[in-house]
Structure formats: C-alpha cells, structure tokens
C-alpha cells in the first residue's frame, strides 16, 4: 500500500494561485498517496514535457466525470481535485510517459483560464482540519479496526501491511490512505470522488467506514463460501454481495459473459410477452440456469429451451388486409380459374371485417398434381398480407415431426409446426401442410393422429408441443392442407377440415395459363425476351394438344422450358436469332407428337369401348377390349383388375347373357364360346365400379358385331337389374374426355348435380347424356354392324335393343 510522508500534510504554498491541470480518468488521486500514472494524451504530454527539469513541480490532478472523453474541457472534470508533486518522470516511448505523483492536499477550482497548450486553472487550497474530539477519535478507531479485519481476511498481503495503519494518526489522513488503495471493483470513481469532496473529516471517515464495511462483508461471505458454512443470510444485502462475488469470480475465470447472456435472454422473453402460465415456467428455468456451471450439459439444454421460448411469436401478429376487392384482385393475378377456392377466401375476408376475433379457417385442397394447390397458399398469404410457410409432410412417419421430441432426448427440438411459426415470426401465418395424404405409420406413431389436435379449432388454442411442454395458441393460424386423393387421409382428419376440390384445368385454362404465366416465366428464367423468342397462339396450342396430357400444368411448363432452352443455346453461341414458336418450330424442337388421337383407330372394331376413370393425377380415358374364342362359356379377365372391377366385369357379362333373347343371341352359342375382357396397361392396377357401363357396352358390341362409336365415352356402375348407379369424379372424367377429343359422354342420371362444377366451355363442347338404365345405352353408343357375326342381331334388329 503506497504511502506518503505524514509531515507532508502541510504542503508549501505555490508561488501563484494557478497550477497546470492534469486530467485523470478511471481513478482518483488522494492526499497521502504516491501513484504512477501513464500519460499519452496530447495536452497531458505537453504538460509533462513542460515540467521536465523542474524540481518539486506541482500539478493539479482532477478526475474526469466520464472516461470516454479523450480531450476533456473543464465541464467534463470534477471541481475538486488534489495538488500533487511530480516525483519522477519516465519516458516510455514517443509521446508516452509514466509520471509518479505524490498527493499533497485538496483544492477547488476557482476559475479556468487556459486549455492550450495544456489546461491551467486558478485554485483554492482546502486546508485540512486538525481539530480532534471524542467522536472523531471513535470514528478513526472504528475505521482502523475494520480495516485491520479486512486485511486479516486477505492472506496474500505482506505481514507488515497492517503496521502502516499505526503510522497514520490523523483520522482524515487515514481515511484518504484507505480510500486511495481501495480496489476499483468495490469503489467506483464516483464513490471515491465523493470521499475526496468530503472536506468535513467526520463525514469523510463515515463514508470510508461504510465502504470498508461493505468490503468486510464481502470477505466474510467469501470465507463462508470457501468453508461451505451454510448460514442463513440477510436476503437483500447478502444476495447482492453474492452476486457481486460471483460476477467477480466469473470474470476472473473468463466466464463473465454468462450473466449478460442470461440477462439478455430474460429481456428477450420479456419482450416476447409470454402468457402468465409460460412466464412462471420461464422464471423457474432462468433461476436454474443461473445456478448451473456453463460446462454442464444441462446448461446448454436449458439455455436452448429458453431461447426457443424467446423466439416463438407468442403475441406478434400481422394485420390482415381485409379489403374484399384487394383480396380478389391478388388471387386473380396469381391464378386463372379456381373460382370455388377464391370464393371461400373472399368469404373469410368479408367475415373478418365483421368479426375480428374469427378463428383461422382450416381448408383441405384435393386435386391432381400440378393444378396449383401449394402455390395457392402463397397467393392467399399475399392477398391477406400474412406470412407464408410450408411444411412438407410427404413420407413423414414419426409423430414427433409434428409434436416434437421430449427434452429428455439428446438433440431434442420442437415439431415442425412450432419451427414454422418461429420462422414466420408471427402467430397468424398461412401454414401449408403439403401432401397430407402421403404420411405413413410405423412403430414411432401416426403423424396423422398428431394433426388431429393441430387442425381442431376447438383444441388448437392450447396446442402442446412435447419439447416446450407449454400451451401455444394456434387458433389464429390459417391452415391449408393439400392432397392428391382421399385414400391416404384418415376420416377423423378429413372431418376437421373444409374440403375444397381443385380440379384439373381445361384446354382453355391451360392455354390462358401458358400465355399469361408460363411463357413469361420461362422466358425470364432462360434470359430471353419476346424479341428473341415469340410464342404464337397456334404454337402454344400445339404444345398443349400434342405434348402434354395431364390435369395440371407442370408438364406443360417443362415443354415450354424445352423450347426456350433450344433458343437459349443458339443465343449463347453468339447467333443473332429471332425465333417464332409456331407448331412447326415446336415439333422441330420437341420431336414427334407424344400424344395422338387414338380414339378412332382403337374403336373401329367391335368389342372396344371407351371408358372414363378417376386417378389421383386427374381424370383419364381407358379402353376396355373384349374378344371371343371357342370354349365353354368361361370369362377371362386381364389387365391388372382388382376385385371391385372384376365383379363389375362379371356383372356385365351376366347381364348380357340374361338378356340373350332380347339381344337375339343364341344362348347355346354363348355356351360354346369363352369371353376375354382386357384393359390395356398391365402395369397399372385398376379398380372401382365405374367401368361397369363400359364393360357392358364392350361385351355387347363384340357379341352383336357392332362397333362402339369412336366419339363416345361412358362411366357408371351397373347392377344385375339393369340400373345405372352414380359414381364419383364426374368433373375430372369430363375434363379428361374433353382433353381426349371426346364429343359425347354418357353419365348416370343421378350425377346430374355434379355438372354444376364442370366449366361451361366443357359443357358447351361435349354432349352429355344422362342414363338411368342399361336399356338406354346400346342405341346411343353402337354403330351399325360392319358385319353380322354368327348368331348376332341383324342391323334391323338393333333398333329393337332399346327395350333390352
């Protein structure tokens, strides 16, 4: 502990009442102290260089109010400082000195009259009061005793340190000596400056005694901690002391940032405005985190858990765009057609204008691939001003993908629902659950069952992820699920959603989509402009008619991209080209037509009928072929037919045999032949009852020798009583017939209501006939026989078949 000569308490008077001023930052110089300081600021360097060679030079040392000011003015300095003698000056380098100062006495600045070349001021010396009384003696003795006790609890100090206290008899000087040597961690510059400005000796001793008392308490607590003595402490004072001690220890260990991180984490959670129930858990976890060692695995687990809570949008929402016209306009800009979907979103926007507390809808879009189900979600989000996130569920087999893993597992994380909400940053985004029909089930659980709570409006306001184990409100999320077919979706899950069927596009729709969306998109993607490649209307029609046959437009976009690539190659080779995508140019680039009209050529012979089928990819046409051979009346079924379709074929053959007399067929002849019913494309499984009408027409055509008209297709389930019963997928089947060039379609009469969903341009171009019994079918579909087979009806007799 550096000290000065006690006799120097009465310094010699300067020649004048002005002294040069040396600003000091981050410390305070007291009388009775000898300290070295580093000088490197320009003004201070000039002052020191001016004092070189002078003996017993005096300077006024004043502390800065803020250490951040590099060249302070008098306003940035305290008004009270210490007159010091320059004991020694050591040059450390260019413009850098170490100056040893001996504090002599206090002074107050009377006036400042110079800043350059260094600061200088007129000062008033503050004389030290040497009057002693009983109270001052008692205060001095108490300070001396408390300081000895502090020194006794610091075993690393030299043994004679306590003896220095006995050499200083004046209480005021003792207070200055102790204050000057107090560690900065326990006494700030402001605290020490307050002691320096305490001209009254009693007040000064009391301030230092309080400071020593706090340090004494710190050392006592440290001793208690080291000896593991568990005693009850005063909560307020002891907790503060412990935290200060812990902070100092962590700083020494290089772990001082943990408390800052925990405090920052607490502040982030506070800003997230978590519910009261969550806040209670958070407080408990933060308390546990503070007591953990940073190196422990549990520390990182708990910290990650709290960071997830802080990052989730507990209260943050986006403001919906509720203008019906704006929503409708955004949807029309992004998608052609799909009126039913647009109508539902517009209805929701209208209701939100009237009821702001309306929960988000839960919609299920079912339709073939490529019709825009997923992109609809993005368009809906844009139209409503909401964030958009997509969760791909195809192939998901683990329930934890939805509800998360419990924190007991290594590497546990929340499920995809909360991950998507964290990424969105709001609690009311548009969340697309893509391909919900393609989730699987295994020993790890059923993700579809986990979605039951997510998609239930009555339950999802308290959705509980396994990782968080806290309720989270999903009621404001707009859930949009997509699927290709019903088969992979459990009934209870479908029951929780509003189903909207998204059909395939008509030829007119595809032409419009290609013209308005796909062609500009692909030209831009390939770095082309209309000047380099121009798509004509006939060229687009050629791509649609001859190179794609699908419900959606993905294949159409790929073919347009192929045409663009061919031009892009020529441009990249340096050719100055300007091409026009005519039908001839399209064929030159894409090759021979991939889809040809095969209706006429395949239905010119008896025994071939055109049917309509529904698939997850949309509607399709299929051909049912029948032939006969000598035999014993057996029926052979091929073409990868499943049970229901096989039963339909058996029903059709049985009905024809039962009506042999009405069809003018010899029953004995039917016993002498075998029938073979076949559906091409063996590799594709086929099932369903809707091909019954087509099988009946094919078998009757074969036996009567009359071909089925090439422009007619049909669908419908049959019964042994000759009734034609309703089927599903009528809209998709009619769209498939329209794509294939069919101009006449027979459907069950009970499917009349399904025609409301069929686009008007399709109904205008296709003749749709309703049939309710098999008696009506043959006159509508059979051509006159090209040759009358043995034992078959004559051409004149075909007119009588309406009474079958």
Swiss-Prot record:
Task: Return one Gene Ontology term, BP aspect.
Answer: cellular response to heat
The UniProt subunit note reads as follows: Homohexamer. Organized in a ring with a central cavity.
Q: Which SUPFAM superfamilies match?
A: P-loop containing nucleoside triphosphate hydrolases, PUA domain-like, Ribosomal protein S5 domain 2-like
Instruction: Return the InterPro entries for the record.
Output: AAA+_ATPase (IPR003593), ATPase_AAA_core (IPR003959), Lon_bac (IPR027543), Lon_bac/euk-typ (IPR004815), Lon_lid (IPR054594), Lon_proteolytic (IPR008269), Lon_Prtase (IPR027065), Lon_prtase_N (IPR003111)
Spell out the subcellular localization from the entry. Cytoplasm
Q: Name the chain's protein.
A: Lon protease 2
Cellular component per GO, a single term? cytoplasm
The EC designation for this entry is: 3.4.21.53
Q: Which SMART domains match?
A: AAA, LON
Give the family this protein belongs to, as stated in its UniProt record: Belongs to the peptidase S16 family.
Positions of the UniProt region annotated as Disordered: 782-804
Q: What induces it?
A: By heat shock.
Taxonomically, the superkingdom here is Bacteria
| Keywords annotated in UniProt | ATP-binding, Cytoplasm, Hydrolase, Nucleotide-binding, Protease, Serine protease, Stress response
Where along the chain is ATP bound?
367-374
